[in-house]
A protein has these predicted regions:
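A compositional/structural signature for long, glycine/proline-rich flexible linkers
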Residues: 1-243
């Protein structure tokens, strides 16, 4: 899950849309040109990634008429937003706090605490009145900014992704899988993983604060392992042959 979400964020960064206030939106709905997890062509998607290490506590002004969620960088559910969230589809202000935050928490927000600095801010817009109306509603109401700049927030920027073929977020199935995982481990507080998982990744050489540099023997083992794991998942989960 961590590598999957890491590569989703890398897809945003490859589009020069990696800042908290930079939001991707599919104004003409999704299409097969964008390669993203569980993606379809009937939803008006919009998403971005928070950077709580850089920005500190961050406000998301959620528009009415959306359905979404916040996930941390281990793909753990944090909170529903929109119709299934505490704003009940009417829109509202969410305040996302970074790991270990002990400062003041102002009133007037739906408060969400994160175990990671990175947070996926994801929602679908209802298109009962058409994609154009949903796009205008979202772009007019969705705002993301640091709490420290609430009195003069920076503009929230949108990029229309419909029809663009450059957006690729699929996790790798070669050795770079482990390099992605190591990069995420180095930039997040290690407490976001439980001790058992920390031990498992340490056994293959991924340790917080240390370089990931397997020798040729271990590199071959890991390269084979990720290819076999990918094939196993495809054969047994993605497209099983059981009736």
């Amino acid at each position: 899950p961590a590598v999957s979400l890491y590569n989703l964020r890398e897809g945003n960064r490859d589009m020069n849309m990696g800042k908290s206030n930079q939001i991707l939106i599919w104004e003409e709905l999704g299409d097969s040109k964008s390669l993203a997890l569980t993606y379809n062509n009937t939803s008006l998607y919009t998403w971005g990634f928070l950077d709580l290490e850089k920005d500190g506590p961050t406000v998301i002004e959620v528009p009415p008429g959306v359905l979404g969620a916040l996930n941390d960088m281990y793909f753990r559910y944090m909170e529903d937003i929109g119709a299934a969230g505490p704003d009940k589809g009417k829109g509202g202000k969410y305040l996302v706090l970074p790991p270990g935050y002990e400062g003041d928490v102002p009133d007037g927000y739906f408060v969400v605490r994160s175990q990671t600095y990175g947070v996926w801010n994801f929602m679908r817009g209802y298109v009962k009145k058409g994609a154009k109306e949903a796009t205008q509603r979202i772009k007019g109401k969705l705002k993301v900014y640091p709490l420290a700049k609430k009195d003069n927030p920076p503009e929230t920027l949108f990029t229309n992704m419909s029809g663009l073929a450059a957006y690729k977020t699929i996790p790798p199935n070669d050795f770079s899988f482990y390099e992605s995982l190591d990069k995420l481990i180095q930039e997040e507080p290690i407490e976001f993983l439980d001790p058992v998982t920390r031990g498992q990744i340490a056994a293959i050489g991924i340790v917080k604060g240390k370089p990931f540099s397997p020798d040729d023997r271990m590199r071959k083992i890991l390269t084979d392992a990720v290819a076999i794991g990918n094939a196993y998942a495809r054969a047994n989960t993605v497209f099983p042959r059981d009736p």
